[in-house]
């Protein structure tokens, strides 16, 4: 009897896009935050996780990274961002695509430098959840969310998810999930199908509010 082929995913690459300019907060990635540059907080968390084999920094700020003591190593790859995908209006999916095309990996974990409170424990648990989902064919990607149960209104003050005349406890309201951009976990295959970090069959992972 022919046994099914088991694919063992081993190489995990973390994608950490970083640019020199920010339209809202000038130079935010390099501003000091509690004793070190903002980008170092999530970078150091990723570096502390042995399951992550490679951290890929897609950037237009190589010289600034060097000034702040960050150099390439066997676990850190600094990629110069092509001019055509530089700028504030460029979709993040285009930047991710540039990395996926050029850096082979079994699993990609994408996060942002603006997640300094994201914990090592959350990253590891999300990764384990994704690996379990893949093994059981439950999902092809994962993204993090905030779980919300509260009363929403539209811009005209019209109730969206509740009846103001019948105020039930908020814990009994329909649960809504807010994408929080903490983490996206996916494969090359799932990315190719949607050309996006969220695949065709994603799973949601609720993160602690203090981290998101």
What name fits each language-model region?
Residues 52, 105, 136-139:
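Short, high-confidence coil segments that cap the C-terminus of an alpha-helix
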Residues 9-26:
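N-terminal nucleotide-binding beta1-loop-alpha1 segment
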Residues 18, 59, 145:
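Short beta-strand/turn micro-motifs composed of small residues
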Residues 11-16, 39, 55-57:
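Hydrophobic targeting segments
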Residues 1-8:
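Short, Lys/Arg-enriched N-terminal segments with co-localized hydrophobic residues
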Residues 38-54, 66:
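A short, N-terminal amphipathic alpha-helix
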């Amino acid at each position: 009897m022919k046994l099914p082929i088991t694919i063992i995913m081993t190489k995990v690459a973390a994608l950490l896009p970083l640019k020199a300019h920010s339209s809202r907060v000038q130079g935010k990635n390099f501003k000091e935050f509690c004793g070190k540059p903002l980008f170092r907080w999530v970078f150091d968390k990723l570096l502390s996780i042995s399951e992550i084999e490679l951290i890929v920094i897609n950037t237009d700020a190589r010289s600034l990274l060097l000034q702040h003591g960050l150099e390439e190593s066997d676990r850190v790859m600094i990629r110069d961002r092509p001019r055509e995908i530089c700028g504030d209006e460029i979709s993040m999916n285009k930047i991710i695509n540039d990395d996926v095309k050029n850096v082979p990996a079994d699993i990609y974990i994408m996060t942002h430098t603006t997640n300094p409170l994201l914990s090592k424990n959350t990253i590891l648990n999300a990764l384990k959840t994704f690996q379990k989902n893949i093994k059981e064919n439950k999902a092809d990607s994962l993204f993090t969310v905030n779980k919300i149960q509260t009363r929403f209104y539209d811009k005209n003050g019209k109730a969206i998810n509740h009846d103001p005349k019948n105020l039930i406890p908020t814990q009994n309201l329909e649960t809504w999930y807010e994408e929080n951009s903490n983490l996206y976990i996916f494969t090359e295959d799932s990315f190719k199908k949607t050309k996006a970090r969220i695949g065709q069959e994603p799973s949601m992972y609720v993160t602690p509010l203090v981290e998101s």
